[in-house]
Swiss-Prot record:
Residues 150-166 are cytoplasmic. It comes from Xenopus laevis. Pfam families: TM2 (PF05154). The gene is tm2d2. Residues 131-179 form the TM2 domain. This is TM2 domain-containing protein 2. The lineage of its organism: Eukaryota, Metazoa, Chordata, Craniata, Vertebrata. It is a multi-pass membrane protein.
Amino acid sequence: MRWPVPPLGYLLLGGQGLLLTFSLISSQNNTSPVTYPDINVSAAPEPRDPLGPLVLCSYLPEEFVECDDPVDHMGNGTAQQELRYGCKKFGGQAYGDVEHTQVMCRALDGIECDGSRSFLRGNRPCIKYTGHYFITTLLYSFFLGCFGVDRFCLGHTGTAVGKLLTWGGLGIWWFVDLILLITGGLMPSDNSNWCTIY
């Protein structure tokens, strides 16, 4: 009795599945460790002369230091724990939803201070602004929403093209997007927050 021979297409599909599985397994085993600069954040340097005119660099006022933007770990909690600062996620609608972190700061050139010139400071919110204004997007959605201009503005290009080709879903998609925008369900695609107008 002979075994039935499966069709060639099934054999090729099974071979591709095995190849994909082995390549995914091998890529997981070939990760390289991430190296971060060694920064001593726990111990403050001892001042050389406590009666001298120099203050610790970490005590300088805001106008004499420049600080980096919060580090984006893109959801990697391990990297955040190793570095001991940075943001796992950006943005949020309410204050409780927004993470806070310390940022790396440096004393400006020409400022004399005691101790390390690079230090961690502050409790900065993990928020980024990329030029999206709520009122502008709301006006786009109200007047030009049937052409998908609001979705193009927010960076949702795929759905914007669909909205454009269907004329806003014959008005239904236009109305739904207007409600989503007002209730906070439609945000910029890069997870940034709305810019505030002062």
